[in-house]
C-alpha cells in the first residue's frame, strides 16, 4: 500500500511539473496564439501607414526584451543565437524588423531614414505590444544601440532597462578609432589598396570587398573564418537593405563617410540624463573602442559594463558565453 501511494504521488508530481515549467511557452492566453507569436504592427509615418513585423518568444510578465537590430537596414535574423540562452532563463523577447527591413514593408522614400522617425516607430511598436516601465527592456546592437539610446533620451519613463551592445555614443569618435587605431594594424599593402579604392569611392569593387572581408572582418567584425560564420548572421547580412545602410551609415567599413545621416551623431554630453539601469557591452577586438563603451557605463546614472575579452563587433557569436552570461545576469538581477 505504501509503495502504491508513493507511485501515485510521483505520478502526480510528474503530471504537474510540466505545466509549471512549460508556462514560459504557453501561448494559450495570448492574443498572438494563432500566429505563433507573430504580430504585424501598423506604423504611422509622415508619408503614410506601413506595417512592421514582430515575433514574441516566451512568457514573462516582468522581463520583456525588444531586440533592435543593427545595420541600419539589417534584420532580426542574426539575433537568433538568443534562442540558445533566453528561454532557459524564462526571458520573454521580441524579434522585430524595423521599417525597410526583411519581413517589414520596404518603402523607398529616403525621408523615412532618420533617427527621429525610427524612435517614433519604436514607440508605436511598444504601444502595440503593450510593454511598459514594469517590464520593457531594450537590447540594441550596433545601430540598434544608437536607436535604443535615442529612444531612452525621449522615453526613458517607459523603460525598465536598456542594453547597449557594441556601440559607442559618438560616430565621430568611431570614425577616429577606425581610421587611427584599427586601420594601421592592417598589413600596410592591404591598407594601401583599401585606401586607393576609397579615395575614388569605388566601394563596390570586388577586390575592395575581398580585402575588407578577408583582412578586416575576421579581426574586428566576427573573429571566425568566413566559412564558419553562422547561418543566421549570413542571412541577415545577405538580406540587409543596402539603400537604408548607405543612406544612414555610408558605403565604407572604416567609419561613416559622405553625407550619411549618422555622420555627425554624438550624444556623449547627454548621457548623464539617463536614470534607468543600463548595461553597455564591448568586445576587445570590436570595430569600436571598448574603452569608450566602458566609459559610457560610468557617465549614465545607473550603468554597468560587460567586457567580452574574446569578442569583436558580434561578441554574441565569438565570445558567446561571456556575452550571454552577462546579459542574462543583468536582466535577471532587475526587480
Report the location of each language-model feature.
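The serine-hydrolase catalytic nucleophile loop
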Residues: 73-84
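Alpha/beta-hydrolase
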Residues: 189-272, 276
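Catalytic active-site module of serine/aspartate enzymes centered on a nucleophile-bearing elbow/loop
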Residues: 303-335
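Conserved hydrolase catalytic core segment
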Residues: 134-178
Amino acid at each position: 500500500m505504501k509503495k502504491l501511494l508513493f507511485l501515485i504521488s510521483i505520478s502526480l508530481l510528474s503530471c504537474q511539473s510540466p505545466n509549471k515549467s512549460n508556462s514560459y511557452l504557453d501561448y494559450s492566453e495570448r492574443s498572438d496564439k494563432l500566429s505563433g507569436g507573430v504580430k504585424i504592427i501598423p506604423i504611422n509615418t509622415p508619408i503614410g501607414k506601413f506595417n512592421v513585423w514582430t515575433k514574441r518568444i516566451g512568457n514573462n510578465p516582468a522581463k520583456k526584451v525588444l531586440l533592435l537590430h543593427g545595420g541600419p537596414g539589417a534584420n532580426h535574423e542574426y539575433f537568433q543565437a538568443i534562442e540558445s540562452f533566453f528561454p532557459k532563463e524564462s526571458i520573454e523577447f521580441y524579434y522585430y524588423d524595423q521599417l525597410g527591413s526583411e519581413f517589414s514593408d520596404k518603402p523607398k522614400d529616403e525621408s523615412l531614414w532618420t533617427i527621429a522617425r525610427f524612435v517614433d516607430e519604436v514607440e508605436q511598436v511598444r504601444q502595440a505590444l503593450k510593454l511598459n516601465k514594469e517590464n520593457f527592456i531594450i537590447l540594441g546592437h550596433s545601430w540598434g544601440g544608437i536607436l535604443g539610446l535615442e529612444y531612452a533620451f525621449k522615453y526613458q519613463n517607459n523603460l525598465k532597462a536598456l542594453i547597449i551592445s557594441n556601440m559607442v555614443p559618438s560616430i565621430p569618435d568611431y570614425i577616429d578609432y577606425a581610421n587611427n587605431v584599427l586601420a594601421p594594424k592592417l598589413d600596410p599593402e592591404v591598407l594601401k589598396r583599401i585606401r586607393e579604392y576609397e579615395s575614388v569611392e569605388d566601394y563596390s569593387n570586388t577586390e575592395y570587398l575581398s580585402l575588407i572581408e578577408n583582412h578586416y572582418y575576421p579581426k574586428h567584425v566576427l573573429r571566425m573564418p568566413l566559412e564558419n560564420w553562422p547561418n543566421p548572421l549570413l542571412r541577415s547580412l545577405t538580406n540587409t537593405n543596402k539603400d537604408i545602410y548607405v543612406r544612414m551609415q555610408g558605403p565604407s567599413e572604416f567609419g561613416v563617410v559622405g553625407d550619411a545621416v549618422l555622420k555627425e551623431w554624438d550624444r556623449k554630453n547627454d548621457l548623464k540624463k539617463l536614470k534607468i539601469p543600463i548595461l553597455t557591452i564591448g568586445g576587445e577586438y570590436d570595430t569600436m573602442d571598448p574603452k569608450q563603451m566602458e566609459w559610457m557605463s560610468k557617465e549614465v546614472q545607473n550603468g554597468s559594463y560587460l567586457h567580452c575579452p574574446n569578442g569583436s563587433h558580434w561578441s554574441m557569436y565569438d565570445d558567446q558565453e561571456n556575452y550571454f552570461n552577462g546579459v542574462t545576469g543583468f536582466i535577471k538581477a532587475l526587480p
